[in-house]
Regions:
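Helix-biased detector of long, well-ordered alpha-helical tracts
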Residues: 1-346
């Protein structure tokens, strides 16, 4: 695939974004602290003494999940990208462009779940739009913007990263790929590995969030920047973070934790788990003095984490140290999740 063309599916390539989108961002403003850039999930405004972080995503609803579970996932997709700012998630704006076939009970079940998650995390809905339209289809039933608020000291961003910072990763790769595929296509998993395997893989669905990861990380001043490894997974996330911050990386591939059920899923369906979408995997650049404490604090809450590399000078590039030696970290470009989902749907 050409880097200067639209992909068949998924996010556009950074080169296309840089040519078409990035040069045309409207009027400049001195209130913008962090604007659009690769590898940063949020934008930040200075509003008086406070800082506000914003992130926008599709509102993603898959009816076959069940509307309550689908809404849980949709909510966390929206809020995980702003939670990584280091500020506290507080507000939600939401646009619901509903398919005509959606029923009143389905909408009520969906919205009850959104409300429950908002109450759990202390988040208020402040405005929105709700309507049914022809031409609107699942799973993208609108969009939403999450807003987090805090002080200057709370804000994390690529400018805080320094040489020697440790790269900390939670849960491991392909969390979202495994959880979604096992729920959407249970028969494929049963056929490949049996019913117990399918149930174990489907249970990964509930780990597709970094809200708790970020809440713990916010308590450590040495956490300099965070990123949710969504599209193109761990490799894509690391690439985007290094590009956004202008630093190099040395990553020990064997140090990255991989859940056994995810390793088996990747082996059975023959995809690179490190290149696959992984909502729920937090990547953080952390002062070496705080890395051990953060990993322990996460582990105490049942969130596996490991230090898997370090930040180096930009001139040293982004390198992965694997079983076969050293190689360059490159952006995967195409996420294997979309290929598998299309194949399984046939």
């Amino acid at each position: 695939m050409s880097e200067d063309k639209l992909p068949e599916l998924g996010k556009i390539h950074p080169a296309f974004f840089d040519r078409v989108i990035y040069p045309k961002l409207g009027a400049p403003s001195g209130d913008i602290v962090i604007g659009p850039r690769h590898g940063v999930d949020y934008g930040v405004l200075r509003v008086g003494p406070k800082y506000m972080a914003f992130s926008t995503d599709p509102f993603f609803i898959v009816p076959s999940f069940g509307f309550a579970r689908a809404a849980w996932f949709g909510f966390h997709i929206v809020f995980c990208d702003v939670a990584v700012s280091g500020l506290t998630p507080r507000y939600l704006t939401i646009d619901l462009n509903l398919p005509p076939e959606m029923t009143e009970p389905e909408l009520e079940e969906m919205w009850d779940a959104v409300h429950a998650e908002a109450v759990k995390y202390g988040i208020s809905v402040i405005t929105g739009h709700t309507a049914r339209y022809t031409g609107c289809n699942y799973p993208m039933v609108g969009g939403a913007t999450s807003i987090a608020v805090g002080g200057k000291r709370d804000l994390r961003g690529p400018g805080r990263v320094k040489k020697g910072d440790r790269v900390v990763i939670t849960k491991g790769p392909a969390i979202e790929t495994t959880g979604l595929l096992a729920v959407l296509f249970p028969e494929r998993f049963v056929a490949a590995g049996g019913e117990a395997f399918q149930k174990e893989a489907a249970a990964v669905f509930s780990r597709m969030t970094v809200m708790e990861d970020c809440a713990i990380a916010r308590t450590f001043r040495g956490v300099h920047v965070m990123h949710d490894a969504t599209e193109c997974g761990v490799w894509g996330g690391l690439y985007e973070m290094a590009r956004a911050g202008g630093y190099g990386l040395r990553i020990e591939e064997e140090a990255i934790p991989v859940l056994p059920v995810i390793r088996r899923t990747a082996d059975l369906f023959r995809f690179d788990p490190f290149a696959a979408i992984s909502e729920g995997t937090l990547i953080a650049m952390v002062d070496k003095k705080d890395a051990g404490g953060l990993i322990k604090a996460l582990g105490d809450e049942g969130i596996p984490a490991a230090a898997v590399g370090e930040v180096v000078n930009a001139a040293e590039g982004q390198k992965i140290m694997g079983r076969s030696g050293e190689r360059n970290l490159v952006h995967p470009e195409v996420d294997p999740y979309w290929i598998l989902a299309a194949e399984f749907s046939k």
